[in-house]
């Protein structure tokens, strides 16, 4: 269900660190990056309506269900997640794969991002697959933070109310009326970009 984060990840982070904590401060090529030298969280910035700030609403990884030896987490807004003590998780991007680390340094891997489905995470005693699918896109002019892309696209994310008993607003990828989850009403979704917010040391 949980895997211990290898020290090599942190060694890599130190090796790659260049004194900057956000991509907008980098003087390197603006090409998307598959590895970041810092831990971060995600926030969803509405791209269709004005926002109260330049980061958007904070996102969390919440427990969806467990099976023997494994746990599934799902990405939703902090405000809609009913269990506020659950999960204090920081994220890492290494080689195009996303990892979530809890306060005990156990980790979860982001599952394959599929059109019409929510952004999920898996932890397993048997190890969970790492999927090379994510990149960090440099902050656009006028924005402070980089954005997260999947399969090279950072404009296909949406926040959708699921309509389930908990009433969570979850992150979906490239959702449409043709491929939506049965509990999601697509017209109630709105487009967002996922902002990468560095975690202070």
Regions found by a protein language model. Name each.
Residues 14-15, 20, 92, 139, ...:
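Short linear sequence elements within intrinsically disordered, low-complexity coil regions
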């Amino acid at each position: 269900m949980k895997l211990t984060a290898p020290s090599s990840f942190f060694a890599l982070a130190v090796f790659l660190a260049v004194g900057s904590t956000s991509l907008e401060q980098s003087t390197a090529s603006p090409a998307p990056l598959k590895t970041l030298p810092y831990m971060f969280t995600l926030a969803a910035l509405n791209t269709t309506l004005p926002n109260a700030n330049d980061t958007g609403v904070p996102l969390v990884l919440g427990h969806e269900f467990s099976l023997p030896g494994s746990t599934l987490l799902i990405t939703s807004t902090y405000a809609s997640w009913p269990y506020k003590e659950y999960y204090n998780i920081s994220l890492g991007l290494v080689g195009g794969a996303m990892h979530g680390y809890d306060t005990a340094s156990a980790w979860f891997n982001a599952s394959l991002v599929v059109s019409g489905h929510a952004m999920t995470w898996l932890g397993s005693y048997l190890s969970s697959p790492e999927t090379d699918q994510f990149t960090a896109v440099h902050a656009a002019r006028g924005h402070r933070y980089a954005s997260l892309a999947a399969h090279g696209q950072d404009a296909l994310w949406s926040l959708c109310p699921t309509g389930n008993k908990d009433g969570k607003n979850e992150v979906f990828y490239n959702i449409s009326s043709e491929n939506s989850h049965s509990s999601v009403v697509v017209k109630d979704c709105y487009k967002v970009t996922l902002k990468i917010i560095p975690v202070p040391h």
